[in-house]
Design a protein with these regions (language model features):
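Bimodal feature
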Residues: 1, 20, 24-27, 33, ...
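Non-transmembrane alpha-helical segments in soluble domains
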Residues: 19-20, 72, 88, 112, ...
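C-terminal subdomain of the subtilisin-like protease fold in secreted/lumenal serine endopeptidases
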Residues: 20, 27-34, 42, 83-85, ...
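Alpha-helix termini
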Residues: 68-83, 137-145, 197-202
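Extracellular S/T/G-rich loop segment that most often corresponds to the catalytic His/Ser-adjacent loop
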Residues: 100-195
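Short, solvent-exposed loop/turn elements at domain surfaces
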Residues: 8-12, 119-121, 140-143, 221-223
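Substrate-binding/access-modulating region of protease and related hydrolase catalytic domains
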Residues: 1-105, 117-119, 168-185
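Acidic glycine-/aspartate-rich tracts in secreted/extracellular proteins
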Residues: 4, 35, 93-95, 115-117, ...
Length: 234
């Protein structure tokens, strides 16, 4: 269900209705490339820090938490491929050591972004709340100086993700970066896994399926060593 209007705004009541509608009509995966700023995002960079704890988030956005809890606990079916719902959120792009909410909520899955070399993207939020990471691009790491056809120095962006964009008010495709691009990779893997499980007549409790995803994910910690060179000039 689309909950945002053309101005990237959403009313909380519409969001809650859409989430409940999804659960009641057979959806078992929420793909959510949105969220608030991390509680530890830097105000000096123009960010307004968001909630820092589950309690603070639930008090500030009680209807949102109620809707997500409804989906997590009521989506799916005891007689279907999965009992419960997967609420998958982008971790945020403030380069903060904590995911933003709702991604940081213990009932949701938080997705951080990695570059093509499996190291964290320069913008991605990270921390103990993150459950998965996936390709989200990193133009700062892959930006290569060059010249255009007129001999002007330009930056040629590489390593970004082909994504949906809004161009002049219309839906289009283009290259972008962010945890919003990483998150759909995990949602897609979850959907593929559930599709195969259905063919095999398997049934999972939601936590069983989450555990299976984590057990079969690729380890990336071994890539986190040495130095990472950036080519982008601020």
């Amino acid at each position: 269900c689309q909950v945002f209007d053309g101005n990237s705004q959403v009313k909380m009541v519409n969001e809650a209705r859409a989430i409940k509608y999804a659960a009641d009509n057979g959806a078992v995966i929420l793909q959510c490339s949105w969220g608030y700023n991390s509680a530890y995002s830097n105000p000096l960079q123009g960010y307004v820090p968001g909630p820092a704890t589950d309690e603070e988030w639930s008090k500030t956005y009680p209807l949102e938490k109620e809707a997500l809890d409804y989906f997590i606990h009521n989506a799916g079916s005891p007689n279907g491929v999965i009992e419960g719902g997967l609420a998958i959120f982008a971790s945020g792009n403030e380069y903060s050591y904590m995911s933003s909410y709702p991604a940081a909520y213990e009932g949701c899955l938080s997705v951080a972004s990695i570059a093509a070399d499996y190291t964290p993207s320069s913008f991605s939020n990270y921390g103990m709340e993150v459950d998965f990471c996936a390709p989200g691009g990193d133009s700062e790491y892959h930006c290569v100086p060059g010249e255009d056809t007129d001999g002007n120095n330009v930056n040629i962006d590489q390593g970004m993700i082909l994504s949906t964009l809004v161009v002049e008010g219309k839906a289009a495709y283009g290259y972008n970066e962010g945890t919003s691009m990483a998150c759909p990779h995990v949602s897609g893997v979850a959907a593929l896994g559930l599709s195969y499980a259905l063919q095999q007549r398997r049934h999972f409790k939601v936590q069983e399926f989450i555990n299976l995803m984590k057990q079969t994910a690729r380890e990336v910690d071994s890539y986190y060593k040495g130095y990472k060179t950036y080519y982008y000039l601020h």
